[in-house]
Amino acid sequence: MTMGWHTVMEFTPSLIGCVIASGNHSFELVRRSRECVINIPTTVLTDKVVGIGNISGAVVDKFEKFDLTSAPAQHVKAPLIADCFANLECKLADGRLIEKYNFFVFEVVKAYVARRPKYPETLHYTGDGVFMVSGKIISRRAQFKPEML
């Protein structure tokens, strides 16, 4: 499944919230297993990201169709996509909003990040088939007050 939207909800523990459409094949798989892997691609995988989002895993093996490399996860049953820049193994932390809003709250239990590139060109979906690419880095580290988070 290609995820169109997610949000960081907390840093300790690391919580991520996302909406998964109830008609999506992944919705029931994730709801039943109470776990998933969030794979973070770079622009190199743009066409594969779109293709993955346009077909259901109920009718095709997406790893095979899109020539993706799977890797075993340590804490969840779902595989990692080794082709991605980062992978987040997640377990359901709060399911109270699933029935009403299809909103899942996951705790990241293990994270993997490639050492290079230091600042990858990651994709950010803006809607209607349009993506924004990360790029320019702006630092305000000297002014940042982490205690205010």
Residue ranges and their predicted role:
Residues 1-149:
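Basic, polyanion-binding surface patches
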